[in-house]
């Protein structure tokens, strides 16, 4: 049985959620996929009280994560410039990269994918658009031989929640506060309500579908 060694960069809610799910499902993955998963190192500038990893190296300098013996780096720090530099460093060290960062793919996708190709590794970004819905795989594999002329859908959950409630008579501000309370919206919801989140997703999907 082969072992997939993973390094995680970032230690917020998404990263800790990934860690917990991976730990919980390790035996199932072994049985179904004939693959052992080992989280070797976590790049975390500070501790997260919601999750205390066990038997894992902690790097306070996230750029040191790719210096460890890992096969895959999972980038979950968010932002653009630092994330781009981190991803490029990992690719140049022949590490595969998984990211949920739509902003860095939207802004620097061409450079990132070119670097991955040059170094013979992959960049997987399914979760950057529509969370767990496999729209990226659908466009790049199942529908790759089809001519796509249009994509439509609900691309931003926060905006959809707010607009649906306003359609029923609710006020914008109170609905936004409810979305934040329920965890749909971030404490700073500007990317959602100003349309940047949806714009990044549209850019990624249109690039994949239309070239």
Language-model features: where?
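Active-site-lining helix/loop region of Rossmann-like oxidoreductase modules
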Residues: 145-211
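Conserved active-site and cofactor/substrate-binding residues in soluble primary-metabolism enzymes
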Residues: 9, 13, 17, 60, ...
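Short glycine-rich anion-binding loops that position phosphate/pyrophosphate groups of nucleotides
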Residues: 78-80, 128, 156
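Rossmann-fold NAD(P)-binding glycine/threonine-rich loop
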Residues: 84-93, 102-140
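N-terminal glycine-/serine-/threonine-rich beta1-alpha1-beta2 phosphate-ribose binding loop
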Residues: 1-93
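Structural motif
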Residues: 9, 75-77, 100, 107, ...
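Short acidic, glycine/serine/threonine-rich loops at helix termini
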Residues: 19, 52-54, 109-112, 134-141, ...
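A short hydrophobic/small-residue beta-strand
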Residues: 96-98
